[in-house]
Structures are given as structure tokens and as C-alpha cells.
Amino acid sequence: MKKTWLITGCSSGLGRSLAKETLKQGYNVVVTARNTDTIQEIVDQYPQSALGIALDVTNQESIRNAVKQAIDYFGSIDILVNNAGYGYRSAIEE
């Protein structure tokens, strides 16, 4: 049985590259981003093994929903990569 990865922050950078490479290796991957439009290309390229889910890692309900959708679809989550970041931006003087 194929292992299932859940990777957060797949809209760009490391998360996106890791999702693509993991899918190329034949794993199931839950590809997440706040805006699913940014990950649709990946899901379209791997329709049998990629599941795109909207996920805001700052929102507990969003996290619960994403995990539930992933388990409902693939049966389990074997590997979690917490790649998404959240930053509070302000002037240095503040």
C-alpha cells in the first residue's frame, strides 16, 4: 500500500517542489494551500495520487477539516510535512 504524505504550504517554493517530487516517486500526496487555485496544476497532473485541499494553518477548524478530508480520501496520513509558514509583518520600529 502506498504511503500518504500531507504537505502544507504547497503553493510555491519548497512545499511545491517537495509535493511534485514525492508524487513523481509514486506516493499519495495531500497537497495543501490557502488558495487551491495555486495547487490545481499539481492535482491535475496527478489525478489518482494527489488531493488538493484548502488549508489555513492558523485556523484550527481548517486543520481539522483538512485532516478529515485526507483520511476520508486516502485512508490514512503516514507522513506530515509542516512546511507552511505564518508571519506577522510590521515595521522594525514596532
Language model: regions and residue ranges:
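Conserved glycine-rich Rossmann-like NAD(P)H-binding loop of the short-chain dehydrogenase/reductase
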Residues: 25-41
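Conserved mid-core segment of classical short-chain dehydrogenase/reductases
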Residues: 87-94
